[in-house]
Amino acid sequence: MAMKRVGHLCLLQIKELLRNPTFYAYLCLFFVYYHYLADGTVRLQQESGLWVNAWGYAAGVFSNYQSTLALGLGAVMLFSDLPLVREYALFEATRCSRNTWIGGRILYVGMVSVLYASLLLLLCAFTSRGRLMETSEWGKLLNTLANGYGFGEYHVPVSLSLEVTQNLTPLAAFGLTVLMSALATAAMGLMMLCLSLIVGRIGAIAAGCMVAVLDFVIYQKLPFWCYWLSPLSFTRLSIVYCPKMPYYPTWQQALVLLLVCNALCMLLAFGLAHCNRAFAKGICKEQY
């Protein structure tokens, strides 16, 4: 019965998200962004007569720090209402147990993270106008980029290495990127959930923004070992699938770290829900 209530609370929040026009406005912005990124790739395919693998292209684009920045900032916007304590939250919190209340929000973060990561990568793949039916061959264009060559005036925002193209199929690279992106997004959402119960919504959003831009700051200014501190950096195959760089985390290490981070944030959220003063203060502050 408790799990049924948790699922019911999660579905209520998902329905509220899908009824919110801002959600669709963000999706349209992402579509325009990925369409703009793919402009050089589309022209290159049209003028060369060669094709790009859509799945491999999406994985390569998400290996770029610019797409990682967009992914992180989009996650902050997506979870900016956590812990969703407005409107019906006070009623929900008094009618069900605290474990059920916080469990519904944790389940919501997990499901929305998978949906969010999958939608963005699919948008990226579809806007490339590449081949969707080919799942095993990277194609000449992506293999050329993986070997370190460019295409002159054609800007193809793909970051791939030979290790990726030699050891993974395009569909496997796409699936691994979806998995890591969903886990990183969930870690951000759970962190914002905990912080919103401790310091309020503004503090949670500020912390989320700092995590979102950390990968970009590391790329520009900080030593590369700092990638271990950025969960969004684990979504980039150019980092987690680069054995030549010993100070980069491997994808296995990144996967374990993301799972541990999510587990710790869930335990902290349950702990905060059982802190009488903190829980009641957070609920009433946002409600009134």
Language-model features, listed with the residues they occupy:
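Alpha-helical membrane-protein architecture signal
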Residues: 3-11, 99, 103, 171-175
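Transmembrane helix boundary and interhelical loop/hinge segments in multi-pass membrane proteins
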Residues: 78-94
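Aromatic- and glycine-rich beta-strand/loop motifs that create alpha-glucan
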Residues: 1-26
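Juxtamembrane membrane-interface segments at transmembrane alpha-helix termini
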Residues: 41-42, 217-225
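Central hydrophobic cores of alpha-helical transmembrane segments
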Residues: 27-31, 203-216, 284-287
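Membrane-helix interface segments
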Residues: 97-99, 200-205
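Junction motif at the cytosolic side of a transmembrane helix
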Residues: 194, 198, 260-288
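Secretory targeting signals
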Residues: 31-80, 103, 107-197, 230-259
